[in-house]
């Protein structure tokens, strides 16, 4: 039984019913509709904290989905799960795959930067300043791209870039 049929929350169930109706009415092929069902069930499982089920659904959605924007969104959600589970290298790889599908996803860049910045802090705390600087520079590179894609959307990142001296003036224009 699809996860959406097991949902007891009235609002979620209502949203699911409406989304299903819209998908049925849209002039898209059956394969894309099936991919959407897997994606939707993956989102539901992810929101419930059932990451294994979410990843299974996302994998199935990726097997069916051909649209790069939708594939990128699915991969981004998978990367978020890997990041939540502490699988940071796998998260980075999956965020990169998401960006390969759809390069206009600033949240992927933002999250990659969070991982690089964390690794930089860990290296710095371990007295490995050269490694820390490399990680911080990588964080700055992806965060600069994120800010360019979403100006004003990541004020905390803009402040970090400025306060660490890693800001490019052209980012803000």
Swiss-Prot record:
InterPro entries: PSI_Ycf3_assembly, TPR-like_helical_dom_sf, TPR_rpt, Ycf3/AcsC/BcsC/TPR_MFPF. It is a peripheral membrane protein. GO terms for biological process: photosynthesis. GO terms for cellular component: plasma membrane-derived thylakoid membrane. It is found in: Cellular thylakoid membrane. Keywords: Membrane, Photosynthesis, Repeat, Thylakoid, TPR repeat. PROSITE patterns: TPR, TPR_REGION. TPR repeats lie at residues 35-68, 72-105, 120-153. Essential for the assembly of the photosystem I (PSI) complex. May act as a chaperone-like factor to guide the assembly of the PSI subunits. HAMAP family: Ycf3. Belongs to the Ycf3 family. This is Photosystem I assembly protein Ycf3. It comes from Synechococcus sp. (strain CC9902). The lineage of its organism: Bacteria, Bacillati, Cyanobacteriota, Cyanophyceae, Synechococcales.
């Amino acid at each position: 039984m699809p996860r959406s049929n097991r949902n007891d929350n009235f609002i979620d169930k209502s949203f699911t019913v409406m989304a299903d109706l819209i998908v049925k009415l849209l002039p898209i092929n059956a394969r894309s509709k099936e991919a959407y069902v897997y994606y939707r069930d993956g989102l539901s499982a992810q929101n419930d904290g059932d990451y294994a089920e979410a990843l299974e659904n996302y994998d199935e959605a990726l097997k069916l989905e051909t649209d790069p924007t939708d594939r990128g969104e699915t991969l981004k959600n998978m990367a978020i799960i890997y990041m939540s589970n502490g699988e940071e290298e796998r998260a980075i790889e999956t965020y990169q795959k998401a960006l390969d599908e759809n390069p206009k996803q600033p949240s992927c860049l933002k999250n990659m930067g969070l991982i690089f910045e964390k690794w930089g802090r860990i290296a710095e705390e371990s007295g490995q300043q050269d490694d820390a600087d490399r990680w911080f520079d990588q964080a700055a590179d992806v965060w600069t791209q994120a800010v360019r894609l979403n100006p004003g959307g990541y004020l905390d990142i803009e402040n970090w870039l400025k306060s660490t001296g890693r800001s490019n003036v052209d980012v803000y224009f």
